[in-house]
Amino acid sequence: MNPDLLNWLDNNKMCFNIIDEDVIEITGFGKMYYEDTSMIKSIFRTDADNNIKFNTMENIQTLQEEGINYIVFQFGDNWYYYDTRKDFEFQILKYVGNRKPLNHTQEFVNLGIHTPFELLNGSFSLTDWIKKAKYLGQSALGICDYNTMAATLILQKECEAAGIQWVFGYSLTFTDGIEKIDAKIYCQSQEGLQNLLRIQKCINVDSENKIIDLQDLLKHGAGNIIVFSKYASFWLKEIGNNLDRFFDSFDDCFYQLDLSEFKAERIDIKVLDATKCYFDYIYDTGDLPPVLICDCYYLDKDDAKNKIILNKIAEGAAHEQSDDQYFKDLDEHWNTMSGLFDEHKWDIEDIFNWACENTVKIAEGAKARYEIERNFMPQYDMADNEKSKYANRHEMFLDLLE
């Protein structure tokens, strides 16, 4: 059996059994015949009717009679499979069958997805993100695109179709007049969705620099949860009791626990210093609980190049490069953070569990949704002269028809 294929299966934590040198069984999915594409000039061929077919050296009917319905092959750097019972289609060999059991099995929801609607930064369709979420046994999925709500309606539709809960999130930058602070907003109710739309307007319509003023942000907190970014701890320490203004405005407040590793040491130091400040001065107060949100821009570790390429297209250079901003399972999250804490000073397991529980808390409270059962038109705002002439929009409409 090809060692590269076995490494691929191990890296993707898939359960499998080797039947013989050409056949492998993915537990919970089925048997696959290994096609060595290095032995052929092209993976495609045409049949007698000029239809394009997969160029397999094996007789498909014979494979099916032996209970082998899939052909697995390498194309480029990835491994794909083909269901011989259907028309040929590339299917990447991921998120199928049974996954190797995790050591950490508590409930957790990924709230850090950045979709392709965050242009030239996030990647992969929402269908792919949802597929991996379900493969990992997660019951909900949250997005947090920066300065855009473009993916929210599609998220709702895709999650409804897949039978999981959705969480509308939004990443932004606000200012107190001196400092600029990053945060995430997560909708909890219909009121929260309306307020998030108002926040979106403040940023993308009213603001010249796409940053919202703190006073405007606090006006639209009802029905929403705010999560302060991993870099915000120094500012949070400085404002002290003024944090109460956020609790008065928002339904709840959290601190983003994200210890993803970057390629540049200076960025890692910045993250670690900010996280240390949070645990030294804020964590023990219990006022601002941690929530485990890793900003995810690509599905798997081997997809990290996506963000680099997209950033170079957008700005000519890729800043804050990382191979660690992918959709992790809980064991991978644990491995990222456990080695960074002094086990004699901190109860790491307790911190980890609390941060995971808070992702579930946010997801369970997320009831905001778009009404898609009816069609709506934009509301017309009457000008002052129209208001003086007509009692309401309907009267104006009828008069204009005449």
Regions found by a protein language model. Name each.
Residues L9, F16-N17, L63, I71, ...:
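A residue-level signal for conserved active-site and pocket-lining positions in enzyme catalytic cores
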Residues E21-K31, D36-N50, E89-N121:
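Mobile, glycine- and charge-enriched loop segments
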Residues I43, I68-V72, W79:
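Acidic, low-complexity, intrinsically disordered interaction modules
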Residues M57-T62:
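Short nucleic-acid-contacting surface segments enriched for D/E, G, S/T with interspersed K/R
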Residues D77, K100-A162, R198-A304, I308, ...:
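Domain-core and long-helix interface of multi-subunit machines
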Residues W79-L93, L153-V167:
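Short acidic, glycine/proline-enriched helix-loop-strand junctions
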Residues N103-E107, D347-E402:
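Non-catalytic structural connector segments
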Residues V167-Y170, Y298-L299, D303, N311-A368:
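Phosphate/diphosphate-binding loops
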